[in-house]
Amino acid sequence: MPHISTGDLVRDEIKNQTEMGKQISDYSSHGLLVPDNVMCQLLQKRITQPDCARGFILDGFPRTIPQAQELEKISTADFVINLQVTDAVIIERLSSRLTCRKCGGIYNERSLKPSISGRCDKCGGELYHRDDDKPAVIQQRLEVYRKQT
């Protein structure tokens, strides 16, 4: 069953330099949520792919009431899980996150270190800190999340 991260969908659009990716790169680089209509378009495009025919797991969606309303129109949810974590834990985890430039693998400097510092265990790619994983940007993302979710 595919795991669909809306953050990954956004990053793929930016990486592939699509028209939509160009429009949303400013939002994500400043820690702002991508507009609802854009997120709904990205999600609808993804969940109509063949691997989603028997179901999928959504990560990071819906974040707003309009997104939830649109999701009800395009799909049905069997289960919903909402995880709650303190801001301090979120900031610590995200500011310690490392991402592989090559395969997108995720590591953490404190809790899930790679075998070789700075290198992905899966593909050997370079690990880096995303621009939106800086504490100030994370704090901004949390504020936006609270206002819009």
Each predicted region: which residue ranges?
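ATP-dependent small-molecule kinase phosphotransfer cores
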Residues: 2-76, 86, 99-102, 130
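Low-complexity, compositionally biased segments
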Residues: 19-22, 39, 62, 81, ...
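Residue-level recognition of specific faces of alpha-helices
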Residues: 23, 67-70, 79, 93, ...
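Small-molecule kinase domains that catalyze NTP-dependent phosphoryl transfer to phosphate-bearing small molecules
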Residues: 38-46, 106-149
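Conserved phosphate-donor/acceptor-positioning beta-strand/loop module used by diverse small-molecule
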Residues: 59, 75-97, 101-102, 110-122
